[in-house]
């Protein structure tokens, strides 16, 4: 927002030629008939005396016309306007001359402005206003010239003239007379420009604010007494006239609305510096209800169904906002509300937040998301649900103020406004949707919610189901905070790689290096089925030199890239989670407080045994002896740090527990406790409601987690529920091999985001393979094992499988490079730069990071480390052979490939079909031109129409960097991605990683049209392969994606162990 920008000044003025306008009105009218251009040059030297004489002469002639008896005629008005136009020109020349004078010295007098002094001394502005009020139907024309004159004087003289009564008084008169009037567009534009300039001057000279505010009040009172202005309906004469005149233009389109909103924001900022302004806006203006009702009206105009052509579309991008006019207006209003909350007085801020929640969020967004009308659910199609959730996701990514964010978090968790139904629960239910588009939009929304790092949301989604610790067996709970198993988990994830991926990696590695680096793998590879030694090709990525990239810049199989990404994401998450009110991690008794902790455990043991009425002197004696330092074995292996039985159960709020907690906290200052929260309720709904959606450090405390909670049955059997959110995620993961590629990318990205949280509780589910889970669903690691077994069974290590794996990897690398270059093109577009300024840039793309690292680290220069070579047993392709001297574009290469009439004619015309990387991919297939069919695995699309005819929609989702690009407009959104999809933001600024797809308009079935992307073709299984079925091709994509995701999880586990070590050292 350009809050302090000044209005653009006139660079040239249209002036009248002909007569001087002397005499009567007839001559004046003839003089204004001929028009000539008369540009004003600031460097033009002029005689100040001649300018002054000419200025006085024009005013005398205009004054003669004003003094005429009777109502003004058309010629009279034209004459006065003509003379006033010349006076404005002379004033502009004089002011330019005054402004360009060098810096004054101590004894130098300020430059004189005789024309301006004459204007003020003769009270010309007041006389002109009084005459303009009698012009009748010509009032707007005269008012326009007056506004031009005031605009000129304010813009050049800054604040000096506001202190002069001959200038301020007529200015307030003309502003007061403009209230409640409907003006033509040109007059509205001049009025808003003048008001904007006045706000800028007042912002820079706050000491004039009280004078202007109370002068406006006095002026209104005088006009009411004179009868020229009706008394306000509110019964008060208090009026900040600049603000009141700007309110009607707050929802206007175009530059007029932008300037009005900028001026209103300046008034809001002034309210923090002057309590009178804040009190007036909050008590006597209607700006807050007007903003909220306007926002609701603009939301109702949004399309009920968003037309998308890409099968991987999952969220609204800045390009979509620019292409939908209704959405553009809505986002302007939302950003303005966000800015008002940021800069306004506390009274205004609180009033706007209350109106937003009660007037827009609950009554408008709630029914739209829940698809309800008057409390009853109504039948809707998938498209309306997708659009409503996309709008909510866009809103959450656009707002930045904690107050607004807190209102939306409360909205998601509120159970009173929607008859006991929570918005968050409804969103979780949609994760089970069989519709791929709705599922992707829902996962993108949850990715945004998890990216907020909000304690209340995490508590409701995961932590409240994990805090009791019952998902971990008692015998395993002592392992939660251990660091060594994280390194073992890294090996565990790498071992889960499908066998076909291991075999492909072994074949791609040179034998000498293979035996030198991993001699153990050579032994294990002998256990695999023997295959004929294929003719190995170089990495396909290295062949695509027309991208202008070296293959080592690819993120495929680049463990350094995953480590870099994991480190930055975990660090950011750790900073945000450090502001939480509670520390959700397993907490053992500190060593320095071991004596006090053991005494507390002894008291708990006595209470426990007293409930059964059984004396246990052995156990009590054992604990007592441990206080004296004696090492004895407890008869009941539940007390003591070394027993290994720990619980996450929160401390009960009874008097004894509170007394014990107080005693412990008093004796040990290093351990902080919190007994005011209840883990079953979100803090947004609890009695101790916090004001911030992400709690500050001042409110930080830690939850006391004891070594043992005796309220838990030690011999209880059965499983526990991890909550609907994790159950839905695990359910989707179990159908990994049946999901589409884009659903799997979002799914892996969502789980990856959870793994970034520096919480050992979450790590016990995701990153700790040595901890057993007693949930009612298969654990995360069990699901991964099942996926490996399924892929190994259905995609055995064979020559055909290796070919399909090679094609799958090649197509993903192909898409990565194309999208990197598409993003570079879009970064230079004006649309991208505009949205880049509107939001915070949270993170650059992974590919850009790695390209910079490639220039600094020698490890990235190693070809085999960055992108392993691919096994292509049937290809004799040499990647270093070139038949042309120029680098070609991707679109031309694809068009040349698919523009051939037949495979046989192609082979005959080009005996060396491996002139590009895509040619090698194309050589793997036969009959591709005749076997293109639409749809995903024969299913219907999201619109309910069967995809029988081929469409040329280029739909892509990259493993590394996947901005959404319009193939014809060549513009992409500023988003970032990592393997499996990572964070999402706008930001502009803000931003965040998404899995956008490249889309183009509908095309014909001819290959002369826009081609289908290799990745979308492969993911839909519509390329016929001589040696593979559609199911095998889908499994190949799943295997490649799973392999890369396991590497990313291994990198996260490694970085999380570093974080834990650092915390202990600090």
UniProtKB/Swiss-Prot annotation:
Organism: Drosophila grimshawi (Hawaiian fruit fly)
Pfam assignment, any one: DUF5917
Domain of life assignment: Eukaryota
Family: Belongs to the FHIP family.
Modified residues (Phosphoserine): 512, 829
Protein name: FHIP family protein GH13096
UniProt biased composition (Low complexity): 658-687, 836-856, 967-996
Biased composition (Gly residues): 18-27
Positions with biased composition (Polar residues): 1-15, 950-963, 1001-1010
Keywords per UniProt: Phosphoprotein
